[in-house]
């Protein structure tokens, strides 16, 4: 954590105390009035503070201990010289004013810190009142009361009359007029492909024609048709098959220098979620660093985005339905690559950032020939390419189930079904744990992503991979207890059945480990703990294999305790911390740790810019030097701060689980 005071702060306080004390006493001794002396006092103190801060906290001084203490010595000598000069000239002693002013200067930060702690305590109390012990999962009722749903669900319209040209951006597909708020401009609901409706349902996204038409970009586009769980935040937001839109946020100040671009991939098990999730609001990140451009977007989900019709009569006309969600993502990245320069972004410095299913998507796109060159850096948290299905069996079963539920027999009949009917069926099928997601089909996605990495698919892509200690409770809080328990049991059973065919000894060792854990906790939680450890290990192995194939890889381990144990601490907390999203964290039952968030935002900005991943001492005031070394070291983030160290032994208590994940 940041220190309230460092030796540098105390030295600056020392200099300011002299400035304030003599700044008031000298004019007063010269016969000036109190207000004139007070004005001089403030000016002298402020100037000395700024000068001392710029000198002491400069990279040159803070990067070298000898320089720091040389500057300290110089400041002391300056004080002695000032003492001698003022004593000789006016008979005043700087020492007479030092203690009183020094206590005042040091006391102000203490009072501010106490105020911040009081505010934090108040927020924690409100969250605990709302969530209790967290056993009911995420609850958004209070947050939704503050939202004007009619306003949120409005749609952008064409503009035929006058518009604010300062807020207008011309792209290849149209002119979009955004909204300015303080030092930020938003462009929301911009289409990046033709609407996948009518005859384009279950077809690959088609590029938009070139246009000079003018459109509003004030309102978020519709979310994809999706499953609504107990802890879904987007129940209030309109949903539509016409969902292929993106949002752009950038600083309002014009500059000729092209900015790095951050593209956010939302989470949601490929079945729910979207860019309207307040958690993914990157405004605070852009506000704190306006020289980057933020982008978020929607893509098709569930049976609209990941379904195999190859065994349905007429299904051969829909060969891309298996991985439509990924094709949408590629289409979005292509639009961004072609148009982001108009918004001040650098098309050659695009970083993609994803959580959970968003992270899985990025790992798959890194292995995909169609996505090659569309991004240069990748931040993935709780995701790996092996999470995609090896065969289309699951997606074929989804199509079979769809036919059963709708009594349809052909693609022609499926195409005639209304959106509402398909949503109703989707809710039933997928809510009953009928899984959905991408498939390593050999067409779009290679069967072995790691082999593709070794063969150069992700050359020139730099990776930042994150894993969490307590992610399982986050998932439970979203989908509910029953779905969570069914998922844990099914995932583990399938994995163990596979391991039986590969290494029966390790499979039995895993079962023994579960029984051992079940002696001190419910069996389902023992299984969940194993699944959670396997998830973290899969991220670790992804980092290892990328590093072995010559990629630059940074690893991160989130080990922060949850505010409410039953809500966990993982994806939602990491997203809020890196984006500086205090309100998003509160909605999901936590209070943003501003110290951790400030440090992680700084690291993220360094990653986007291509700067060295290290802090020199006091680069962030109160934070010592941190050097985030590449894999196999990892940046461990805990309540006690950040440190870089190996983490393999932290991810599991049983080495058989590592072999288990290597086999899978």
Regions found by a protein language model. Name each.
Residues 318-341:
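Alpha/beta-hydrolase active-site loop
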């Amino acid at each position: 954590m940041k220190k309230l005071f460092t030796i540098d702060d105390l030295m600056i306080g020392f200099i300011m105390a002299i400035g304030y004390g003599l700044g008031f006493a000298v004019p007063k001794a010269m016969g000036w009035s109190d207000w004139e002396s007070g004005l001089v006092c403030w000016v002298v103190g402020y100037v000395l503070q700024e000068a001392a801060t710029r000198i002491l906290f400069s990279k040159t001084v803070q990067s070298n201990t000898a320089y720091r203490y040389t500057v300290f010595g110089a400041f002391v000598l300056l004080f002695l010289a000032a003492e001698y000069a003022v004593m000789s000239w006016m008979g005043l002693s700087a020492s007479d004013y030092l203690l009183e002013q020094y206590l005042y200067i040091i006391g102000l930060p203490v009072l501010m810190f106490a105020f911040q702690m009081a505010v934090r305590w108040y927020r924690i109390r409100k969250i605990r009142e709302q969530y209790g012990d967290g056993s009911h999962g995420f609850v958004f009722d209070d947050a939704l009361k503050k939202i004007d749903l009619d306003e949120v669900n409005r749609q952008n319209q064409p503009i035929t009359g006058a518009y604010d040209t300062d807020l207008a951006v011309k792209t290849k597909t149209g002119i979009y007029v955004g909204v300015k708020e303080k030092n930020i401009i938003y462009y929301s609901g911009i289409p990046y492909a033709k609407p996948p409706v009518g005859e384009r349902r279950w077809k690959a996204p088609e590029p938009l024609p070139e246009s000079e038409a003018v459109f509003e970009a004030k309102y978020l586009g519709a979310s994809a048709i999706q499953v609504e769980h107990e802890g879904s935040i987007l129940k209030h937001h309109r949903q539509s098959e016409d969902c292929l839109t993106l949002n752009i946020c950038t600083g309002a100040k014009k500059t000729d220098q092209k900015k790095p671009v951050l593209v956010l991939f939302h989470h949601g098990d490929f079945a729910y979620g979207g860019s309207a999730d307040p958690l993914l609001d990157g405004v605070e990140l852009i506000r704190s660093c306006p020289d980057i451009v933020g982008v978020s977007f929607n893509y098709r989900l569930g049976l609209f985005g990941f379904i195999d019709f190859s065994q349905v009569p007429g299904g051969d006309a829909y060969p891309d339905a298996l991985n439509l969600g990924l094709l949408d993502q590629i289409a979005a990245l292509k639009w961004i690559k072609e148009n982001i320069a108009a918004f001040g972004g650098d098309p050659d410095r695009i970083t993609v950032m994803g959580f959970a299913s968003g992270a899985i998507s990025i790992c798959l796109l890194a292995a995909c020939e169609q996505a090659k060159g569309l991004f240069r850096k990748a931040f993935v948290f709780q995701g790996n390419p092996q999470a995609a299905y090896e065969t289309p069996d699951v997606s074929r079963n989804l199509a079979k189930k769809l036919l059963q539920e709708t009594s349809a027999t052909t693609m022609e009949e499926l195409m005639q079904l209304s959106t509402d009917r398909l949503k109703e069926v989707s809710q039933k099928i997928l809510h009953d744990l009928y899984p959905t997601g991408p498939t390593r089909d050999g067409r779009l996605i290679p069967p072995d992503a790691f082999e593709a990495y070794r063969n150069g698919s992700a050359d020139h892509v730099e990776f930042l991979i994150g894993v969490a200690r307590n992610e399982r409770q986050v998932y439970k809080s979203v989908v509910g207890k029953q779905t969570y328990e069914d998922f844990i049991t099914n995932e583990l059973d399938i994995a163990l059945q596979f391991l039986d065919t590969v290494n029966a000894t390790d499979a039995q060792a895993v079962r023994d480990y579960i029984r051992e854990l079940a002696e001190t906790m419910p069996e389902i939680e023992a299984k969940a703990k194993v699944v959670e450890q396997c998830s973290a290990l899969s991220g670790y192995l992804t980092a290892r294999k990328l590093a072995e194939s010559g990629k630059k890889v940074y690893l991160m381990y989130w080990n922060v305790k949850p505010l409410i144990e039953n809500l966990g601490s993982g994806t939602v907390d990491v997203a809020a911390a890196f984006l500086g999203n205090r309100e998003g964290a509160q909605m999901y039952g936590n209070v943003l740790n501003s110290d951790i968030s400030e440090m992680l935002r700084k690291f993220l900005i360094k990653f986007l810019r291509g700067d060295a991943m290290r802090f020199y001492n006091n680069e962030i005031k109160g934070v010592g030097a941190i050097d985030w070394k590449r894999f196999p070291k990892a940046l461990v983030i805990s309540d006690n701060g950040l440190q870089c160290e190996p983490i393999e032994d932290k991810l599991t208590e049983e080495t058989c689980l590592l072999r288990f994940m290597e086999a899978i």
